[in-house]
Amino acid sequence: MRTIALLLAYDGTDFAGSQWQTDIRTVQGALESAWEALTQERRRIVLAGRTDAGVHATGQVAHVQTTTRHNLQTIWRGLNAHLPVDLAIQNVGEAVPDFHARFSAIQREYRYLIDCAAAPLPQLRHQVLHYAGTLDVAAMTAALKLLEGTHDFAAFTTATPAQRSTVRTMYWTRVGDYEWFERRLLAIEVAANAFLQHMVRMIVGTLLLVGRGRMTVDQFGEVLASRDRRLAGPTAPAHGLTLTAVRYPPGLIRWVEPSKRQNGTTKVEQPSSYVHEE
């Protein structure tokens, strides 16, 4: 039995989330169908993180246990040949036998994009939240920094069963410029050991109150300390959010070299968001 790791990118617009659901189009469902078409095996493919309907990914990771004898390049090309246009394998790797895409992960990173221009750019309508106004980026940065470290994030998640911990460790945060289609956007980026359901979108929705002057930095900190969801802002729309990276301890995965991608003729440098071992 082999354990194969997959690096995924997808446009979440037309997926009902990443996790498999009966008779509903999901990322996991599309992957498992493509795997069966390629290998004639029915296997459960496990994703590192669950993304909601409309949320995108450029650095999602999955694993599958298999007896296929296909080499990694054949798996890569074959899966992409069977996958829909809004889901693609970016890299494949041979993982250690006990590797688990979810439980072996030590860090996950998300980016939320906001366009503050007077008029929206139609090409970005599925990946960027349009907000026609001025935001106080300095205040948003200061508020977001309050989340760094280990905290109880109960105020920034939906109702959670009492037995589940809402404590998470936020490793770093950033609010800054991001250019796309020659458009200057505002990016909110966060990295943590794990995230709660809707956590990033609730943080962004509350940060927007700070940016608009409807909540102070101190009040944002009070929301965190309160553990009360009712004090936080609205949940930001899903389409502005992208899972950009999942990171693992070194030595768990041997990824295919970028120079061996697909046709093997052009060396492609691997973007930093695709480096999944530290």
UniProtKB/Swiss-Prot annotation:
Stretches for region Disordered: 259-278
GO BP annotations listed: tRNA pseudouridine synthesis
Reaction(s) catalysed by this chain's protein: uridine(38/39/40) in tRNA = pseudouridine(38/39/40) in tRNA
One Gene Ontology MF term: pseudouridine synthase activity
Cited InterPro entries: PsdUridine_synth_cat_dom_sf, PsdUridine_synth_TruA, PsdUridine_synth_TruA_a/b_dom, PsdUridine_synth_TruA_C, TruA/RsuA/RluB/E/F_N
Superkingdom of the organism of origin: Bacteria
Binding site for substrate: Y110
A Pfam family: PseudoU_synth_1
Keywords per UniProt: Isomerase, tRNA processing
Residues the record marks as active site: D52 (nucleophile)
EC number annotated for this UniProt entry: 5.4.99.12
Biased composition (Polar residues): 261-278
Complex formation: Homodimer.
Function noted in UniProt: Formation of pseudouridine at positions 38, 39 and 40 in the anticodon stem and loop of transfer RNAs.
Family to which the UniProt record says this protein belongs: Belongs to the tRNA pseudouridine synthase TruA family.
Protein name: tRNA pseudouridine synthase A
Organism encoding this protein: Chloroflexus aurantiacus (strain ATCC 29366 / DSM 635 / J-10-fl)
Gene expressing this chain: truA
